[in-house]
Amino acid sequence: MKTFFCNRTVDKGEMKRLIKWVLLNYGTEKTTRLIDKLKTMGFHYATHAGISLGIDDLSIPPIKSAFLLNAENDIYENDLRLKRGQITSVQRLEKALDIWNTTNDTLKTEVVKYFRSTDIFNPVYMMAFSGARGNISQVRQLVGMRGLMADPQGQILDFPIRRNFREGLTVTEYMISCYGARKGLVDTALRTASSGYLTRRLVDVAQSVIIQQVDCQTTQGLRIVPELEKIESQLIGRVLFEDVVDLETGRMVGYKNQDISPALALKLIKQPALTIRSPLTCRFHAVCQLCYGWNLAQQKLVQLGEAVGVLAAQSIGEPGTQLTMRTFHTGGVFAGEATEKVYSPHNGIVFYSKQARGRKIVSKYGEVAFLTFEPLKVKIKNDNTTSVLEFPSFTLLYIPPGQTVGEHQSLAELSRIENKQNFQQFEVGTENVQKEFMSNCSGQIFLPQRQNALINEDNAGTTTFNYSEMWLLAGKILDSKTLVPGDQIKNALYPIRSKINCEPSRLTTTLPLGYVFPIDSNQTSLSKLQSTDAETLKQLPLLQFSKLSADNLKFARSYALELNKTLFHCDSLSKYRFITSDLEHLPFKSKNLFFNQDTPTKKVPTFKIKFSRFGKADKFNAKEKFLLLRSVTKLVSTQTNPLKTQFANNLFVQNSINKNKKTFLEVVKPLKTFQKKTNFFPSPTHENIKSFNPSLQNGNLMSVDADYVRLNVQYGKGFSSLLNCGEVRATNCMMTEKDQIAFKSPVCDLKMKVGDYARVEDQLTTSTRIPLSGQINFITAENVLFRSVQPYLLVPGSNVVVKHGSLVQENSVLGTLMTSQSTAGDIVQGLPKVDELLEAREPQHKVLTSMHAKLSTLFSQYGKIYGLREGCELSFQKIRQFLVQEVQDVYQSQGVYIGDKHVEIIVRQMTTHVVVVDAGKTGLLPGDIVDIRRIEQLEHTGFFAGVKYRPMLLGITRAALMAESFISAASFQETKRVLSKAALEGQIDWLTGLKENVILGRLIPAGTGLY
């Protein structure tokens, strides 16, 4: 062997290349000896060097503290913009995650630089970068910062772990990192099992694919566009389908049936398109030598008898353990790589041309930035240093000219847009998501009147806004129920100007034994009610009625109730209070209590009650937003006309407002109580439900004699029974001392007047900034009195469920924000994705097109143009290429590279079956699944003439069970079914695959056994 001198660092990649080169040039024996010598030398020097980790080897780059300080400043600026109402809470969270993710990535780069510049023989550096043990991500956690963690639900927390393992974690950081650590261990265990099962299915589906002949004489090839990045998986080791001529020189570059070496591949890369041979286009039942190409391990044509199916299955299954198991849910930055940011090299003032071509845009985080349309030079100048930075086109500049920047401050973001045409499609790959936003204090809503701000208002009282804002004026919500004229008010030290807003509370009372359920529009109605036990009687607190307008109230405090009899009736309007009584009743299935004792005004909780045993529930749209489930009660009116009362609809519409403004010491008179009741079903009950009571049959008026209905009797289908609104209280909003800020300021210099709204950090005077957002309430000679205010930004498409002037408590839902998040965020990644593709499952998200639907569409198009057989073949070819590309994308995104031919062999096994539509005069039946190659063979004999079929995509499990060998299929899954079917049909197993021969103890038809 010649002596070669090679002066370079031999890491894992270099070692691979060296061994591969020796193997190809000098054969197996000499390579084995070389590897043995390398091993001995490696161990010898490892013991001399002492490559074991000590605590001193974990050196932290000094620049870390500067990076963290900058990140903290960015976070502070981000939070300030939220307080000023310039961004939404969703944008604040996404920006915070982006800041920490970018800081972490930049710090990782700095760690590598620091090691390289200070100590390249550092054990940590040598281990990680030689590929011997560990990786860059683990090094980052040892000496950089641990970074962002996920909570148990998989959501990324915006509280990062700033420390590393060298510094040690705080208790809080340790608890946060526990989620991820345990998840990682569970993931690894699950991944091993899933990967093993995937390999088993792949081997079972492809075990019969063996190289049996040299050439299949195919008339079809696979058309590809060569790409330099994919040269290894795409070209090297393939066979050319036709001669290739250089378009510029006219010289022959490659010949038909020539295998492509690495040298030839570099020449072919210049061709606009190539046609190569592929297992997808092979005419044989297995695969021929030329369609398969090289055995990639030996870099020469595959030998006859090679079990390439098993090889392909192992090549795809083995890297399965390296794939991620989790479903990413990150909303952008974590699903892909972090955007590349540019930082200021030192502090100074930024200078660049104001005439630069570009436009101002708002980034997805709500920041105003300048997008350049051409390359731009930016100067950063201070007393000592001047730096010039050159930015390419389509860079986002966050700093305007003339502004001062600090060292390591974020200046710009390099965009992935390459030209102006792509600018329009900048937001491709995002979807709109609605997220709720809450009030952070109690108070009154103020919606500024803006032209074109309001887009529409629907029946439910939901208002949709364009870009606009909303202000929440802080104040304490007081209930005026206890105030009567003459009462003294403790600590009534409130400004005279403060307004008191009154609105009817959302108190609702029900008819006797009624239960109120707040519901959303179009939610499934609770239309059926069941008594759980027809015999057992239990106790329940009942409603005590007090007289309002009638004398003849018929009500006994305590007596037993007979089944199916009226409990009581009254002919007056009533208000109620809970009492505990000895009355007995039939218990309901739901065990929930709907009201707290003696607190009838408390907001009624919403309960989910499932009556799924009783069939399909109905949808209904209730304007009143309340569904009343109640025992049927008799109401007797002495008047000749039915009970008619004026009914104020807005009392029952969710979020309804009564905008009466009164001073605080006036007592608000309670509104009258109203009652309305319709005594018929608006729609007939289901036909198949019969009642023991003839008055409850389909379409009849509702009887009021039955108190409870028996099992399987429908209680009512969307009945309109409106609520008895008892004593309605007024609610007042008043400003307390903690809701106002007073500070001294020279009034002559004021830039604002009484009633103006100001945001935090706004300029009040030339020397004073406002510490909190607020509304100017009062100005004296020395002081300015502010009312605390929280501004909210309403982005386009936001829904607001509160009205102007309405009162809200702390942590109330104000509406939903429309926000866009990356669609890559929620796509299943890694092993589950490979599994979904190879099993040809229907996608869970309806946005994604089903492969089965795609195949059907392609066949209907091609079938009309090219006929049955050609159309079937062409639609199969398209779907095969799509599947190969999708599987490869998943593996390549995780840094795993597999030869295309391995995936093609598996995909080919999935796409070789058709479903018989019209059997003609053959012995087949419509719906039979047949191998298309069998039909093609029999069509030549004329036996299969007239048969009609359509292509079918089978997942690998079904394809393995549909195998020609019933012995192979029975040993895989569903043994009884497969053997019973084979016995009934009298199938013959020709023992062509490996598995069936192994089971029977025969010589396998591979290797020398082929002959």
Curated annotation (Swiss-Prot):
Its main location: plastid. InterPro entries: DNA-dir_RpoC2_beta_pp, DNA-dir_RpoC_beta_prime, RNA_pol_Rpb1_3, RNA_pol_Rpb1_3_sf, RNA_pol_Rpb1_4, RNA_pol_Rpb1_5, Rpb1_funnel_sf. It is found in: Plastid, Chloroplast. Its cofactor is Zn(2+). Its EC number is 2.7.7.6. CDD domains: RNAP_beta'_C (cd02655). SUPFAM superfamilies: beta and beta-prime subunits of DNA dependent RNA-polymerase (SSF64484). Keywords: Chloroplast, DNA-directed RNA polymerase, Metal-binding, Nucleotidyltransferase, Plastid, Transcription, Transferase, Zinc. It catalyses: RNA(n) + a ribonucleoside 5'-triphosphate = RNA(n+1) + diphosphate. GO terms for molecular function: DNA binding; DNA-directed RNA polymerase activity; zinc ion binding. Zn(2+) binds at C216, C282, C288, C291. Binds 1 Zn(2+) ion per subunit. It comes from the Eukaryota. One of its GO terms (biological process) is DNA-templated transcription. In plastids the minimal PEP RNA polymerase catalytic core is composed of four subunits: alpha, beta, beta', and beta''. When a (nuclear-encoded) sigma factor is associated with the core the holoenzyme is formed, which can initiate transcription. DNA-dependent RNA polymerase catalyzes the transcription of DNA into RNA using the four ribonucleoside triphosphates as substrates. Belongs to the RNA polymerase beta' chain family. RpoC2 subfamily. PANTHER family: DNA-DIRECTED RNA POLYMERASE (PTHR19376), DNA-DIRECTED RNA POLYMERASE SUBUNIT BETA (PTHR19376:SF68). HAMAP family: RNApol_bact_RpoC2 (MF_01324). This is DNA-directed RNA polymerase subunit beta''. It comes from Ostreococcus tauri.
